[in-house]
Amino acid sequence: MSNWLVDKLIPSIMRSEVKKSSVPEGLWHKCPACEAVLYRPELEKTLDVCPKCNHHMRIGARQRIDIFLDAEGRAELGAELEPVDRLKFRDGKKYKDRLVGAQKQTGEKDALISMSGTLMGMPIVVSAFEFSFMGGSMGAVVGERFVRAANHALENRCPMICFSASGGARMQEALISLMQMAKTSAVLARLREEGIPFISVLTDPVYGGVSASLAMLGDVIVGEPKALIGFAGPRVIEQTVREKLPEGFQRSEFLLEHGAIDLIISRGELRPRLARLLAQMTGQETPEQAREAAAVA
């Protein structure tokens, strides 16, 4: 019996353990909406949109920019800027410790990435919020990176697009963070005066000081399907007004129906549809027209 254990059973158990450990971690992902178990490589092909229920999962700022801009000719704006704990703020944890933790978790210095590049050949500037960095909250660095992106658009007379995903102003920066609402709104007013298009794309979620400033100041405001958009959360509103809110309240579909946003576009359609829209707004050829002209020539 002892020989059987040594020769047969133990090697069998060891082989089983090796097989289990050889399966890469994160190969499968459960959809938070329909709970379907999805194969990660297949999910990446659909841009993190569930093929079963069309739920648009949250994605990082760099991933969003990677799938939106053309691959060539990109340049990051304001990458050298880093947050500073000027107020020595502390709640349950020191602000500087929260920053270090968020930077380690995301690999980013702060919650906004701005980049110049092209969209189907058209020069453009893009900003995208990183929600995983302290809830995409807006502080001094976020505001300054946004302003630098807008100034680049002004100097080069090219359109700007911002993908918002934020819980609002960063409370750890107090009045400094609130000032960013005015700062970003002011530079967008300059874009409008110069006739340079600004498109705001609202992704899940957009709340607080970001929704009350730059996110709602687009010449065209686009929402991703079923994105949560508002100032205060629905639970807070219900507790305040002591009434049951309508079904789907603060979802992008509800806002479209009531005229608060202009369009809802699925993630996979953002590139071609926004390219056509910007071509029309700037008087350029659409990508389709450019291809047709090249084919005729």
UniProtKB/Swiss-Prot annotation:
Its EC number is 2.1.3.15. Signal peptide: none annotated. Its main location: cytoplasm. Pathway: Lipid metabolism; malonyl-CoA biosynthesis; malonyl-CoA from acetyl-CoA: step 1/1. InterPro entries: AcCoA_carboxyl_beta (IPR034733), Acetyl_CoA_COase_Trfase_b_su (IPR000438), ClpP/crotonase-like_dom_sf (IPR029045), COA_CT_N (IPR011762), Znf-ACC (IPR041010). It is an enzyme of class 2 (transferase). Keywords: ATP-binding, Cytoplasm, Fatty acid biosynthesis, Fatty acid metabolism, Lipid biosynthesis, Lipid metabolism, Metal-binding, Nucleotide-binding, Transferase, Zinc, Zinc-finger. A zinc finger (C4-type) spans 31-53. PROSITE patterns: COA_CT_NTER. GO terms for cellular component: acetate CoA-transferase complex. Residues 27-296 form the CoA carboxyltransferase N-terminal domain. Gene3D superfamilies: 2-enoyl-CoA Hydratase, Chain A, domain 1. One of its GO terms (biological process) is malonyl-CoA biosynthetic process. Binds 1 zinc ion per subunit. The keyword Lipid biosynthesis applies. Its cofactor is Zn(2+). Component of the acetyl coenzyme A carboxylase (ACC) complex. Biotin carboxylase (BC) catalyzes the carboxylation of biotin on its carrier protein (BCCP) and then the CO(2) group is transferred by the transcarboxylase to acetyl-CoA to form malonyl-CoA. Belongs to the AccD/PCCB family. This is Acetyl-coenzyme A carboxylase carboxyl transferase subunit beta. It comes from Pseudomonas putida (strain W619). The gene is accD.
